[in-house]
From Swiss-Prot:
InterPro entries in the cross-refs: Ankyrin_rpt, Ankyrin_rpt-contain_sf, SecEffector_AnkRepeat
One Pfam family it belongs to: Ank_2
Gene3D superfamilies linked to this entry: Ankyrin repeat-containing domain
Name of protein: Putative ankyrin repeat protein R840
Start and stop residues of the ANK repeats: 78-107, 108-137, 139-167, 169-197, 198-227, 229-255, 256-285, 286-315, 317-345, 346-375, 376-405, 406-435, 437-467, 468-497, 499-526
Lineage of origin: Viruses, Varidnaviria, Bamfordvirae, Nucleocytoviricota, Megaviricetes
PANTHER family with a match to the protein in the record: ANKYRIN REPEAT-CONTAINING PROTEIN (PTHR46586:SF3)
Length: 526
């Protein structure tokens, strides 16, 4: 029965009977308690749901020291914070109520009106202005944020009340332009933004985000708007209609050695590239950077178009195929090879960096086309081990890479960089770590990492922890790896090796727990 009554009637009954605890028998109110476990603030929820009568009764219950509403979840917001939430939500009746209870509309540098302007609540803005809020605080932030968010009626109101639209380096028109609010831009110009002043920054911001109408309007307002940064930004972001418009108004499409076509190519904007070519841009400027950038970023259609227009894919020692390989763009790599690119230029750069970056498909393709995987002392394998690319490692080894190169350097690299899976694979290919004179355990202890799992694995398969004058415990101690130090000692490491190097370095680096442990095991700190 209780739930059939609207909250307003129910609260009036409670007021008449003066029995406030009955309020909690109505589910419209009582359901608020279900929010406690979700960490939603009760008062914020009341404001959000516009239950002003409930808010008033909560306050009445607080006044009467009611046990339930004295709990923390009813009391963790200040009056000013309640005001801010109301302004953000546009609950003008709540705003008035909290102000009547003592909330300060000018607190936190007039934060209330900033929230109302940001979220477009004009009635709240009007009320706050009528009650003395400072609309010009923080360099007229209120009008700036209203411009930024496109709230035109609020912008008009604030201007009519004296807001300075040119404050903060003309930020209002910049933000409006950046976000494409053409009508606000027009108002700002009509209200005092000097049409002979520098329009370039608002134009560039509008260009960047593709707001053609704003660009057209601003350019029409100033003969000084000739900054060629605008057309570069349009080309960079692929806004073809803006590129065409700016070109028609005299912007230099060939600025900075045809940078426009280079950046458009690099970002994959084919239609922009075609337009710029039709207007005379040189696709081969800066030693064919256009096709190189397109290849680097994997834009196959742009690469194909540029090649059809005469771009040289072999410029700068086949940089196009090298960069495409390095970044894993297999289709671009295949196309460039089909057009005569040399994959082996600069000491097989392509396969070395494809391996380093883990691009297995590219590596497999390059090898199928004759790339030398043994180049530079098995550099592809070493790079793959360094970065932890197990698939590439397996492929290279299966294709003839030498896991014993440079005194087992692949194993050292894997151990020293924490790549346990690669280390296990390399060992499985016929390496007996118990007989090789390589300090694998010591390498795993180096630097700030300390790869305990690798240390345990190596010891479990017979690696010598005492190699290189007990390098393992010396480094583990120096870098503060207490768990590794204990494990090594338990497995026979000499804590006094190299004239007590371990404890001296642990002490010097401030690893007191390691020092204490080593002392307990017989080390001497002199």
């Amino acid at each position: 029965m209780y739930d059939n009554l609207p909250p307003e009637i129910w609260t009036n009954i409670i007021s008449y009977t003066n029995e406030f605890n009955l309020l909690f028998t109505n589910s419209n109110f009582f359901s608020l308690f279900n929010l406690i476990n979700t960490k939603i603030n009760i008062i914020e929820h009341v404001i959000k749901r516009e239950h002003l009568s409930v808010q008033k009764y909560i306050d009445q219950l607080k006044k009467n020291c009611n046990e339930i509403v004295s709990k923390k979840f009813f009391n963790d917001l200040t009056l000013n914070e309640c005001l801010f939430i109301s302004c953000k939500r546009g609950r003008n009746d709540f705003v008035k109520y909290f102000v009547s209870k003592g909330a300060n509309i000018r607190s936190r540098d007039n934060f209330a009106i900033k929230l109302a302007c940001e979220h477009g609540h004009i009635e709240v803005v009007k009320y706050l202005i009528d009650n003395g809020v400072d609309i010009r605080s923080e360099k007229n932030y209120a009008v700036r944020i209203a411009c930024n968010n496109g709230h035109i009626d609020i912008v008009k109101l604030l201007i009519s009340k004296g807001a300075n639209i040119r404050d903060y380096d003309n930020c209002a028109i910049k933000w409006a332009s950046e976000n494409g609010h053409i009508e606000i831009v027009k108002i700002l110009v009509s209200q005092g933004y000097d049409s002979t002043s520098n329009f370039n920054e608002p134009v560039i911001l509008a260009v960047k985000n593709g707001h053609l109408e704003v660009v057209k309007y601003l350019v029409s307002q100033s003969d000084r708007c000739r900054n060629n940064s605008a057309i570069i930004s349009a080309a960079e972001n692929g806004h073809i209609e803006i590129v065409k418009f700016l070109a028609s108004r005299g912007s230099n499409i060939r600025i900075d050695d045809d940078y426009t076509i280079r950046i458009a190519s690099g970002n994959g904007h084919l239609e922009v590239v075609k337009f710029l070519v039709s207007k005379g841009c040189n696709i081969r400027s800066e030693i064919d950077h256009a096709v190189q950038w397109a290849s680097t970023n994997g834009h196959l259609e742009v690469v194909e178009y540029l090649v059809s227009q005469g771009a040289d894919i072999k410029s700068e020692y086949d940089r196009s195929v090298r960069c495409a390989s390095q970044n894993g763009h297999i289709e671009v790599v295949k196309y460039l090879v089909s057009q005569g690119a040399n994959i082996r230029n600069i000491n097989d750069y392509a396969v070395r960096y494809a391996s380093e970056n883990g691009h297995i498909e590219v590596v497999e393709y390059l090898v199928s086309q004759g790339a030398n995987i043994r180049v530079d002392n098995d550099s592809p394998l070493l790079r793959a081990c360094l970065k932890g690319h197990i698939k590439v490692v397996k492929f290279l080894v299966s294709s003839g890479a030498d896991i014993r190169v440079n005194n087992y350097q692949p194993l050292l690299i894997a151990a020293g960089n924490g790549h346990l899976e690669i280390l296990k694979y390399l060992v499985s290919q016929g390496v007996n770590v118990s007989i090789i004179n390589v300090p694998l355990v010591g390498i795993a202890c180096i630097d700030g990492y300390g790869y305990f799992e690798i240390v345990k694995y190596l010891v479990s398969i017979g690696a010598d922890i005492n190699l290189a004058d007990d390098m393992a415990i010396r480094l583990a101690s120096e870098y503060g790896h207490l768990d590794i130090v204990k494990y090594l000692v338990e497995n026979g490491a000499n804590v006094r090796a190299e004239n007590d190097y371990a404890i001296k370095q642990a002490h010097r680096k401030g690893h007191q727990e390691v020092v204490n442990y080593l002392l307990s095991k017989g080390a001497i700190l002199s």
